[in-house]
Amino acid sequence: VANDKIIIHGARAHNLKNIDVKIPKNKLVVITGLSGSGKSSLAFDTLYAEGQRRYVESLSAYARQFLGQMDKPDVDSIDGLSPAISIDQKTTSHNPRSTVGTVTEINDFLRLLWARVGTPICPNDHIPISSQSPDQMVDRVLELSERTRLQILSPVVRDKRGIQKKVFEKIKKEGFVRVQVDGETYELDEVPELDKNKKHTVNVVIDRIIIKDGIRSRLFDSFEAALRLSDGYAIADVIGGDSIPFSEKYACTICGFTVGELEPRLFSFNAPIGACPECEGLGSKLEVDVDLVVPDRTKTLREGAMIPWNPISSQYYPQLLEQFCEAAGINMDTPFNKLSKKQQQQVLYGNGDQTFHFHYENDFGGVRDVDVPFEGVINNIKRRYKETNSDFTREQMRKYMTELPCPACHGYRLNQRVLAVKINGQNIGEVSELPISKAITFFEGVQFSEQQEKIARPILKEILDRLTFMKNVGVEYLTLSRSARTLSGGEAQRIRLATQIGSNLSGVMYVLDEPSIGLHQRDNDRLISSLKAMRDLGNTLIVVEHDEDTMRAADYIVDIGPGAGANGGKVMAAGTPKQIMRSRKSLTGQYLSGKKMIEVPKERREGNGKHIILKGAAENNLKNINVDFPLGKFICVTGVSGSGKSTLVNVILKRILAQKLNNNSAKPGKYKSISGIRNIEKVINIDQSPIGRTPRSNPATYTGVFDDIRELFAQTNQAKMRGYNKGRFSFNVKGGRCEACHGDGIIKIEMNFLPDVYVPCEVCHGTRYNSETLEVEYKGKNISQVLNMTVSEALKFFSAIPKIKRKLQTIEDVGLGYVTLGQPATTLSGGEAQRMKLAAELHRQSRGKSFYILDEPTTGLHMDDIKRLLAVLQRLVDAGNTVLVIEHDLDVVKSADWLIDLGPEGGEAGGYIVATGTPEEVAKVKESYTGQYLKKMLERDKAL
């Protein structure tokens, strides 16, 4: 049947070579191949793009204009396509209001649960707050034994100062005769004069009643009168016994604290009715951080201790500070920490209303001569952040601010009314702070009355299902209140995956981009089971993946190759994992069958004997640990997801080194001390962010080789005769570039209701340069033709020019020989951008004292790419540098000289050092999950 396959004919997106592919439906299909071979072009730019486009095309033109345009992918035909949903690596929302709970929609169910079965508890008197109708009040009183005497009271004044004259007049008008004032009963005419400075309580006596048959309607009328007078409150005061307070609103019967009608939107921190008024539902407030304003307190004011006021473009603030200090008698040559407390406060927070004389002349002759109060550096930053219209200034001021938990709601984001509503003693904010594993325990053990149970059961099922899906994809250490913008790409993707599993759709084609990123081997098995569960609902899963376990678990594998870029784009093999392993053409198959492998290094380096020692690391979940980083080695930090690796390396170590060596202002996480920094000269973070934000940035400009190439062109005889310098060969400045397209080579034409069309510039035909510039040639090629060469081609072409050859060789060495010199930076994948940065580092003349940090460098890399990456990293270490990677990939882990394994679990149960040492030593540690998997791998490698 043709219906059980997706059949692609003639796919040509990017580097795909007009390929035909058949993919079985309702199966777990892995698309694999080298980085840059065309996997994403097939999965995302062909299959997903066409599935999405067909859906959008079926909508009206009016609806389409809101959905953004979908280009038709370059493919002849695709048959058997289902509606497509893509779950990719783009981190979710950057909106501070977006949390794990809102992204997964669990918050909607929590709000419903608390609104329907939550009990409000007064925060002042700690008694349950409920609301009763007059009928319920009558029923409660009729439960008292017969002949009980009581009076129905209406509390009109509670604990208020004043003589309450108007209140008594109103009561008299209503026709009542008795009142209770501060516990004593009086006739209205005999009430003594009240002390206006004391607090008083006034209750109107509505009726005096003895419980007997036939009293119901009289009681009902009395309660109605009481509720009307006091705006919703009544008291049944048993003579010689207790009094029973009633309220028809959700309000405390003692202090009047009101919660109001419980409805789901009340529990949303994104609705004004529920949000904390202080922080407007953000849970944190931006405050100026003294440590960022004065990072080094041993400096004097004259040496620039106040970072924000150091001279940049004008001397205004330095002059202001100097003249204030003179007036206030503060010595600018005393280290800041040696100034008195009062003087430090004056500089930071100002001098109140006291004025001093300030004289200032700017560079343009403008003079300011005034008596002004001194507002203080911190108040100045606050004011400028609030008042400025300039984004630049706001961004500058933001650098000195830190988000602190809101003092009013303690970071729960909700107002006091909402936080008063509890289930099993917990409010919605407290439950959102629990790690998902603990939240599951809470909801499984929650106790309800019989009636509540009926209401809560369906809501609880939805909540527990969704929480369990999140546990199954390996993020049980996250909390629902965690801000979505602090999640890593892998976490964000797995959360969206859990949401999709929760939506229970079937007949959909899901396209996933490396869901195993950032997952430890241990958590991988659960992820694979989740993927299979989605498949079993009747969905097709197309997963772009390099992970060996996922490939072995797949129903079908498509291997794209043989190389990358222009050398890729063909189907090398397609079939079940067993068929792929037998294929001679498939590189992936050779690694899966063990014909090819990444060798374990023959020996582990001893290092240079020096260390960086970090003591008392305690940010997030780190348990006050001491970590020793031996220098001159290849170090790998491992541990299950959420064990604290990123906190240790990115939030603490990297920021300390960047602050001390690069004058960076990002504030490191909590730690006690660090030693050994003098043993390194610079810290270099090589991440997967793009090497340039615009299409004008490309590998040639980024690695600096383009400067050398332009220099070379300017040295040619033709260029010398015409008087061209190297600026003539730049497509970014006037002179040599084509002015019709400003050196872009393409022109964007906007079309309404249709996708924007990019056409080659008709003046320069996409070459970016004007015809005069293109007449200058080196070895028969002009500058535009050189930009269109791949790195491998250029390497042969410039083999006689050592300076150019060296830079190109390093790009070739990191496995990017297939990239063209002029390829726009925006089209490089994260893995390619990271390796481009490595290449740029490799050709810098290193003095062997650099400290490189890489966070999961194997993202997007095939086993064969990893082999190359490792060779490059080992070269950096051989030159005497230190390389520190955070990594789960066992091929990288087994190749390191030194491992630091954190754990044992993720979240609260993590943050300890489980093992350190060489891979062989860590493999012997039974408590280490990494060690267990490493042991299997090292044994398997020996067997092969």
Residue ranges, per PLM feature:
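Conserved phosphate-binding elements of NTP-dependent enzyme cores
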Residues: V1-L944
